[in-house]
Each structure stands twice: as structure tokens, then as C-alpha cells.
Amino acid sequence: MPNWGGGAKCGACEKTVYHAEEIQCNGRSFHKTCFHCMACRKALDSTTVAAHESEIYCKVCYGRRYGPKGIGYGQGAGCLSTDTGEHLGLQFQQSPKPARSVTTSNPSKFTAKFGESEKCPRCGKSVYAAEKVMGGGKPWHKTCFRCAICGKSLESTNVTDKDGELYCKVCYAKNFGPTGIGFGGLTQQVEKKE
């Protein structure tokens, strides 16, 4: 029977949904205020919704209910689930394990797996990706990426390195460049013989 004068029915509350407040998902209409996960009641949008038949869920709840189960099928980083699967008729057997120390027993094993944070040669502190500038084959903080003599801020186009230190081209030429007549000025007095 046709629905005269009214809009579609909301998939959550079954009341009429008018066009101005309508969100469509999986062929069904919802009020904007009813577009919540049917398990945890979290507000949903087009990027966080996962539909199963006539029900809508957030991606985490959808994965818990309808995703693969068992060892090796975690919900991803940041999610901790203590669900044993009893509501699905699964038997969970936990084997006793010896207590382990929380601290890393072998730091070299940890650094081999996750990598050690790189250290800035100038200040000795860790250099993270957001502040990392490469110079002389080493990572530097943006604030430490300066000439060792004049303190001028450096860029990849005007940096030179010597013995693990960074210099601007001018300071490098003055201190380590060629010397003598024709190389940036006189470095020795030439005596005239009369």
C-alpha cells in the first residue's frame, strides 16, 4: 500500500523520516538522530557505518559480531577484547603460563624489532619523523640544522659537512676551502723586491 503524504519509515525507530532529516544506508532511511550503532549506540556517519542485513553498526562492533573469530583475528591496534565467545557457544581454554616481567629483558632484541630512535648529533636527543632533517647522512632536528660556526639556519641547497659537523657554504669556504691568491683573498703578504 502506498505511503501517502509521508516519508519513508526510519530503520531504527519506525517513525516517518522526512527528506530534510534523512540519512540513507543499505537501502533504508534513518533519522539523523537515530543513525547510531545498534550495539554501542555510538553516532555513525558514512565512513564509520557497517551494515548487516537491516542493522547498522560501527566498524568495531560489526567486526566483533560478524567478523572472523579465533587466534590471529584481532580487531586491530587500540582495541582490547576480553570476549571469550561463550555467547556463540565457543569453549575457551586458557593454558597456564609462567609470569613474565613487563620490562624488556633484552634491549637489543627490542631495538632490532622496533628500531631505536635516531639521535641528533648536535643535541644528542631523539629525532622523530616530524622534525627530522637529513644532513651529512645523519638525522638532525630542524632547530639544530644550523651552521656550526655562524649559526645560520641551513637548507639542503646550502649545507656542507666536514667531520660530522654542518657548515654553511661561506663558513666552509673560509675555514676549510683552498687558500692563497685567487681563492677568496690574500692569505699571505707578498713582498716586492726593488
From Swiss-Prot:
Pfam families for this protein: LIM
Region ranges (Interaction with CLF2 and isoform 2): 94-105
Residues making up the signal peptide according to the UniProt record: none
An annotated GO BP: insulin receptor signaling pathway
Organism: Homo sapiens (Human)
Entry-linked CDD domains: LIM1_CRP3, LIM2_CRP3
GO molecular function: actin binding; actinin binding; identical protein binding; metal ion binding; structural constituent of muscle; telethonin binding
Entry comment, domain topic: LIM zinc-binding domain 1 is required for self-association. LIM zinc-binding domain 1 and LIM zinc-binding domain 2 both are required for optimal actin-bundling activity. LIM zinc-binding domain 1 mediates binding to MYOD1. LIM zinc-binding domain 2 mediates binding to SPTB.
Localization per Swiss-Prot or TrEMBL: Nucleus; Cytoplasm; Cytoplasm, Cytoskeleton; Cytoplasm, Myofibril, Sarcomere, Z line
Disease affiliated with this protein: Cardiomyopathy, dilated, 1M: A disorder characterized by ventricular dilation and impaired systolic function, resulting in congestive heart failure and arrhythmia. Patients are at risk of premature death.
Protein name from the UniProt record: Cysteine and glycine-rich protein 3
SMART domains assigned: LIM
Xref: PROSITE patterns: LIM_DOMAIN_1 (PS00478), LIM_DOMAIN_2 (PS50023)
Gene Ontology, cellular component aspect: cytoplasm; cytoskeleton; cytosol; nucleoplasm; nucleus; Z disc
Annotated gene: CSRP3
Main location: nucleus
Subunit structure: Self-associates. Oligomeric in the cytoplasm and monomeric in the nucleus. Homooligomers preferentially form along the actin cytoskeleton. Isoform 2 interacts with isoform 1. Isoform 1 but not isoform 2 interacts with MYOD1 and MYOG. Isoform 1 interacts with TCAP, ACTN2 and NRAP. Isoform 2 interacts with TCAP and alpha-actinin. Interacts with LDHD. Interacts (via N-terminus)with GLRX3 (via C-terminus) and PPP3CA; GLRX3 and calcineurin compete for interaction with CSRP3. Interacts with MYF6.
Organism domain of life: Eukaryota
Tissue: Cardiac and slow-twitch skeletal muscles. Isoform 2 is expressed in striated muscle. Isoform 2 is specifically expressed at higher levels in patients with neuromuscular diseases, such as limb-girdle muscular dystrophy 2A (LGMD2A), Duchenne muscular dystrophy (DMD) and dermatomyositis.
Keywords: Actin-binding, Cardiomyopathy, Cytoplasm, Cytoskeleton, Developmental protein, Differentiation, Disease variant, LIM domain, Metal-binding, Myogenesis, Nucleus, Phosphoprotein, Repeat, Transcription, Transcription regulation, Zinc
Region (Interaction with TCAP): 1-5
Functional summary from the UniProt entry: Positive regulator of myogenesis. Acts as a cofactor for myogenic bHLH transcription factors such as MYOD1, and probably MYOG and MYF6. Enhances the DNA-binding activity of the MYOD1:TCF3 isoform E47 complex and may promote formation of a functional MYOD1:TCF3 isoform E47:MEF2A complex involved in myogenesis. Plays a crucial and specific role in the organization of cytosolic structures in cardiomyocytes. Could play a role in mechanical stretch sensing. May be a scaffold protein that promotes the assembly of interacting proteins at Z-line structures.
Entries under InterPro entries matching the protein: Znf_LIM
